[in-house]
Regions:
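Long, charged, glycine-rich C-terminal linkers/tails
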Residues: 113, 268-277, 470-483, 577-599
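Charged, surface-exposed helical/loop "interaction arms" that form contiguous linear patches used
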Residues: 375, 379, 389-392, 409, ...
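Charged catalytic and DNA/RNA-contacting regions of genome-maintenance
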Residues: 11-346, 354, 358-374, 378-469, ...
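N-terminal amphipathic/basic-hydrophobic helices that include classical n-h-c signal peptides
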Residues: 1-12
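Extended, charged coiled-coil "arm/hinge" scaffolds of SMC/Rad50-like chromosome-maintenance ATPases
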Residues: 429, 512, 516-550
Length: 626
C-alpha cells in the first residue's frame, strides 16, 4: 500500500531454470528484456512501464520513484538471478503522480501497451508515446491556470546570444537576441522558464535558475535547426519571421523544436510561427529591479501583495496570463500605449466593460484547449468548454454593436464560427464523462450506426426483465433474479434456500453470503452479443471523436486568433474595472524628458496598510533627477 493509499501490484515471476551450460551473462525474462531495450533509450528519465491497470517502475527508477512519490518499494520475483526492485501507480491516478513529479523538476517517459494481449502470442508490444517534462506539459491538471509554463533555449555566449521560448500549452513561440549575460538573467527573471536548454560545454552560468538542461553541441548547428524550422512551418525561408540572417536565433528556436519533437512524438500543428521580440520595443528591467518592484512575486515569494495581484481582476485564465505578459514586459511605444489607453477609456464610459466581463466568465481556457486539440489529447469536456465559448461570441458581438465606434474598436473582431458551434452541439452530449474511453460522449442522432449498436445494450434491461419472468416460471423459484455487474457480467441469482430447485444446465458463476449466482447457455449467448456490440460501439465512438478533432484541427489557426482577441478584450476590461475601482488615471505621454505626478499613490502600499494612504507629488525633469 503506497503512502497515498493506493495499492501497488505484486507479481510473481520464477527465475530462469539453472543449467551447467549457462553463460556468465544473467538471463532475463522476456518482459525484462523488453523493459531494458526501452529503458536504454531513456537512461536518465523515469520510465513508467504500463502493465495492465498499473504503470510500473523497476530497479533504480523504482527506488527514485518511491522517494519522490511516497509509494511502496517492493520486489517483483527475480530476473537475471536477482530480485527486481519495483513500485507502481494505478493508471487512473496517473495525472496526480505526474503533477508531483513535475513540481519536483522531474521528467517521465510514458511507455504504453500499443497492442492487445493475445493468449499464446507472447508479450504485448510497448513503446514510449510521450516524455513528460516540466517545460512540456499541456494537461489542465498539471498547469497553473494563470501562469505560463515555458520551455526556453539559450544559444551563443559572451556578447552575442539568443533566447527562444515557447509554451506548448498555448503555441506561443518567441525569440529575442541579447548582448550580455545580465540581459539573459533579466529575461530569465521575467519568463521564469520551467526548463532552460543550453549547449553542453558552453560555460554559461546563470545565478537565477536551477532548471538548466544541457543539450549536445550538434543540436545547436544552425543549418540543421534552419531545416527543422522550415519543415515545421512549411516555408522556404525564415524571412517572414525576421530571423533569416540571425543564426543564433535560428539555433535557439531549432533546439526548442527538436526537444519538443523528441518528447512529444507527434505533430505540433498549433505552432504556427515565431515572433521576434525586439529589445527597443520594451522597457528594460534587470533581474534585481524586477524582484524589488514585486511585479509578480513579493520579496517573500508570495503573489498576493504584488502589482499583478492588485491589477489582475480578469475573469478568464488566458486573460490573466496575457495581463501578466503586458505588466511584466512594459511597452515603450507611445502609439501602442495610446491605443490601449483609448480602448480602456471606451470601456470605462458607462461601465461598458461589465456586460463583456459577465459573458466572458464562462468562456474557459480556449487557448490551452486548442493546443490539446492540436496534439490530440483534448478531452470531451474540453470540447464542451469550446462549444460554450463559441456560443458566447454572438452575444459579445451584440454588446459591441450596441456601443459607439470607440467601443466597437476596443472589442475588436470576434468571429462566431456558427458551423463549428453547431457541429459540437450535434456531436457531444451536454455533460460528457471525463474520458472518451468511458464511452457515452457522442450524442444520440450524430451517427446512425453508433445508435444501432447502442440499441441492444440500452434494451438489455427489458430483455432481463422478460428473461427473469421466464426463468421464474420454468424453475418455480419466485425469488429468482436476473442481473448484471461489471466484474462478473450477467447472472441468475438464487438464494441458498432454493438451491434444490436449480436446473442442471445452470453453471455457478459467483458465491454470495446468502445466494449463488449462475449463468446458462442462453444468457451467455446474450451476454456475448451485448458485449460485442458494446465493444464495437465504443470503437466507433472513439472513431467519431477522432474525426471531430480532425475537423477542429482544420480550423486551429483562426480559432487561435479568436482566443488572442478574447484575451485582449478581457485584459482591457480588467484594466477598465481596476481604473474605476481603484481610482486610477491614464498618464499624458509627452515628447519631453520628465515625470510629473500629482496626488500619486503607491498601488501596493495603499492596499496593505490599515490607515489611508497619503498622496504625494513628484516632479522630475532633465534638471531634477533622483
Amino acid at each position: 500500500l503506497g503512502g497515498d493509499g493506493h495499492y501497488v501490484t505484486l507479481h510473481r515471476m520464477s527465475p530462469p531454470a539453472s543449467s551447467k551450460k549457462e553463460s556468465k551473462q544473467p538471463k532475463h525474462t522476456p518482459l525484462m528484456q523488453q523493459y531494458f531495450r526501452i529503458k536504454a533509450e531513456f537512461p536518465d528519465t523515469l520510465l513508467l512501464f504500463r502493465m495492465g491497470d498499473f504503470y510500473e517502475v523497476f530497479y533504480d527508477d523504482a527506488k527514485r520513484a518511491a522517494k519522490l512519490l511516497d509509494i511502496t518499494l517492493t520486489t517483483r520475483g527475480e530476473s537475471g538471478g536477482e530480485p527486481i526492485p519495483m513500485a507502481g501507480v494505478p493508471h487512473h491516478a496517473m495525472e496526480n503522480y505526474l503533477a508531483r513529479l513535475v513540481r519536483q523538476g522531474e521528467s517521465a517517459a510514458i511507455c504504453e501497451q500499443v497492442s492487445e494481449p493475445v493468449p499464446g502470442k507472447g508479450l504485448v508490444e510497448r513503446k514510449v508515446v510521450r516524455v513528460v517534462t516540466p517545460g512540456t506539459i499541456t494537461e489542465e491538471a498539471l498547469l497553473e491556470s494563470r501562469q505560463e509554463n515555458l520551455l526556453a533555449a539559450l544559444a551563443g555566449s559572451g556578447k552575442r546570444m539568443a533566447l527562444a521560448w515557447l509554451e506548448l500549452a498555448s503555441g506561443r513561440f518567441m525569440v529575442r537576441e541579447l548582448e550580455s549575460l545580465e540581459e539573459v538573467e533579466a529575461q530569465i527573471e521575467r519568463l521564469q522558464p520551467a526548463e532552460l536548454l543550453v549547449e553542453e560545454g558552453s560555460g554559461v552560468v546563470l545565478s537565477n535558475t536551477d532548471r538548466v538542461h544541457s543539450r549536445a553541441p550538434w543540436k545547436f548547428e544552425s543549418k540543421q535547426c534552419r531545416k527543422m524550422l522550415r519543415e515545421q512551418f512549411r516555408i522556404k525561408d525564415l524571412v517572414g519571421f525576421g530571423i533569416e540572417d540571425s543564426p543564433l536565433a535560428i539555433s535557439a528556436a531549432g533546439v526548442l523544436l527538436d526537444y519538443l519533437q523528441e518528447t512529444q512524438r507527434t505533430a505540433l500543428p498549433h505552432l504556427q510561427g515565431i515572433q521576434v521580440e525586439q529589445a527597443d520595443e520594451f522597457m528594460h528591467l534587470d533581474a534585481i529591479s524586477r524582484r524589488n518592484l514585486e511585479i509578480e512575486a513579493s520579496m517573500s515569494g508570495e503573489q498576493k501583495h504584488t502589482l499583478v495581484g492588485i491589477l489582475d481582476s480578469s475573469v478568464t485564465a488566458m486573460g490573466g496570463r496575457l495581463l501578466r505578459r503586458w505588466i511584466g514586459n512594459p511597452l515603450r511605444s507611445r502609439v501602442r500605449l495610446a491605443a490601449r489607453h483609448k480602448a480602456i477609456g471606451a470601456l470605462q464610459a458607462g461601465l461598458d466593460y461589465e456586460p463583456f466581463r459577465e459573458e466572458l466568465r464562462g468562456v474557459g481556457d480556449v487557448e490551452r484547449i486548442l493546443s490539446r486539440i492540436a496534439i490530440k489529447t483534448a478531452r470531451p469536456r474540453d470540447l464542451t468548454t469550446l462549444r460554450h465559448a463559441l456560443g458566447v461570441m454572438p452575444r459579445l458581438q451584440a454588446i459591441a454593436e450596441g456601443g459607439d465606434k470607440d467601443l466597437k474598436q476596443a472589442a475588436g473582431e470576434l468571429p462566431a464560427f456558427p458551423d463549428l458551434h453547431e457541429l459540437l452541439e450535434r456531436a457531444i452530449i451536454d455533460e460528457p464523462p471525463m474520458l472518451i474511453r468511458d464511452g457515452g460522449v457522442i450524442r444520440k442522432g450524430y451517427d446512425e450506426e453508433l445508435d444501432e449498436l447502442r440499441g441492444l445494450s440500452e434494451n438489455a434491461s427489458e430483455f432481463l426483465l422478460n428473461y427473469e419472468k421466464e426463468q421464474k416460471e420454468i424453475t418455480g423459484i419466485s425469488s429468482l433474479k436476473v442481473g448484471y455487474n461489471r466484474v462478473h457480467g450477467y447472472f441468475i441469482e438464487v438464494t441458498h434456500t432454493h438451491q434444490q430447485l436449480v436446473p442442471t444446465e445452470y453453471t455457478r458463476r459467483q458465491t454470495l453470503k446468502s445466494a449463488e449466482r449462475y449463468i446458462n447457455e442462453e444468457l451467455k449467448v446474450f451476454e456475448d452479443k451485448v458485449m460485442t456490440r458494446r465493444e464495437r460501439a465504443l470503437a466507433l465512438e472513439k472513431h467519431c471523436y477522432a474525426a471531430l478533432l480532425e475537423t477542429l484541427l482544420g480550423e486551429i489557426e483562426p480559432l487561435q486568433h479568436l482566443s488572442e482577441r478574447i484575451s485582449r478584450l478581457e485584459v482591457l476590461c480588467a484594466f477598465a474595472e481596476r481604473a474605476d475601482r481603484l481610482n486610477l488615471v491614464q498618464p499624458d505621454m509627452v515628447d519631453s524628458e520628465g515625470l510629473h505626478i500629482e496626488g500619486g499613490r503607491h498601488p501596493l502600499v495603499e492596499q496593505v496598510q490599515d490607515e489611508p494612504f497619503t498622496p504625494n507629488d513628484m516632479h522630475l525633469d532633465e534638471d531634477t533627477r533622483m
